[in-house]
Amino acid sequence: MTPLIFASEGFGLNLNIFETNIINLAVVVFGLYKFLPGFLGKILEKRRTTILSDLKEAEERLAQAQDSLSQAKDDLSSAKQKADKIRNDCKVRAEAIRLESEKRTVEEMARIKQGAASDLSAEAARVTSQLRKEAAELAIEKALAMLPKKLDSNTQDNFLKQSIKNIGDN
């Protein structure tokens, strides 16, 4: 039987170790088993160390970022409180300024009203005095104008006698 016949008659199995390269495969598998773990182990260990280092750095950066975020939140809260305090102080100050302005306005109006009242009183007194003076002058002029018409010589003599008598009694 020739190898060609075996191949044509069914499934053929070649049991010749040297022809099938089983030894070569065994050597390669044994070499991989013996040397590959050391070589790949070093590469994998180096990669594992790098990954762990990167992970540790990332965790540190995360912790720093969280600390920074916490600090920023505290600063924001503090800034909001300061802004609220400033806003409230401004409202109080504005109200105080408004009240002071109203008070000064009322005082100024009272002063102007008082000044106007005193000016009005002074003007009324001046006008009253002027009217009295003019009325007295007018009465004197009228009396002087009527006196010559009403006084005749007998009346003048009686008037003079009466005046002398009054002076003498005093």
Swiss-Prot record:
<keyword id="KW-0138">CF(0)</keyword>
<comment type="subunit">
    <text>F-type ATPases have 2 components, F(1) - the catalytic core - and F(0) - the membrane proton channel. F(1) has five subunits: alpha(3), beta(3), gamma(1), delta(1), epsilon(1). F(0) has four main subunits: a(1), b(1), b'(1) and c(10-14). The alpha and beta chains form an alternating ring which encloses part of the gamma chain. F(1) is attached to F(0) by a central stalk formed by the gamma and epsilon chains, while a peripheral stalk is formed by the delta, b and b' chains.</text>
</comment>
<protein>
    <recommendedName>
        <fullName>ATP synthase subunit b</fullName>
    </recommendedName>
</protein>
<feature type="transmembrane region" description="Helical">
    <location>
        <begin position="22"/>
        <end position="44"/>
    </location>
</feature>
<dbReference type="Pfam" id="PF00430">
    <property type="entry name" value="ATP-synt_B"/>
</dbReference>
<keyword id="KW-0375">Hydrogen ion transport</keyword>
<keyword id="KW-0406">Ion transport</keyword>
<comment type="function">
    <text>Component of the F(0) channel, it forms part of the peripheral stalk, linking F(1) to F(0).</text>
</comment>
<keyword id="KW-0066">ATP synthesis</keyword>
<dbReference type="GO" id="GO:0031676">
    <property type="term" value="C:plasma membrane-derived thylakoid membrane"/>
</dbReference>
<comment type="function">
    <text>F(1)F(0) ATP synthase produces ATP from ADP in the presence of a proton or sodium gradient. F-type ATPases consist of two structural domains, F(1) containing the extramembraneous catalytic core and F(0) containing the membrane proton channel, linked together by a central stalk and a peripheral stalk. During catalysis, ATP synthesis in the catalytic domain of F(1) is coupled via a rotary mechanism of the central stalk subunits to proton translocation.</text>
</comment>
<dbReference type="InterPro" id="IPR028987">
    <property type="entry name" value="ATP_synth_B-like_membr_sf"/>
</dbReference>
<keyword id="KW-0793">Thylakoid</keyword>
<dbReference type="GO" id="GO:0046933">
    <property type="term" value="F:proton-transporting ATP synthase activity, rotational mechanism"/>
</dbReference>
<dbReference type="InterPro" id="IPR005864">
    <property type="entry name" value="ATP_synth_F0_bsu_bac"/>
</dbReference>
<comment type="similarity">
    <text>Belongs to the ATPase B chain family.</text>
</comment>
<keyword id="KW-0812">Transmembrane</keyword>
<keyword id="KW-1133">Transmembrane helix</keyword>
<keyword id="KW-0472">Membrane</keyword>
<keyword id="KW-0813">Transport</keyword>
<dbReference type="InterPro" id="IPR002146">
    <property type="entry name" value="ATP_synth_b/b'su_bac/chlpt"/>
</dbReference>
<dbReference type="GO" id="GO:0045259">
    <property type="term" value="C:proton-transporting ATP synthase complex"/>
</dbReference>
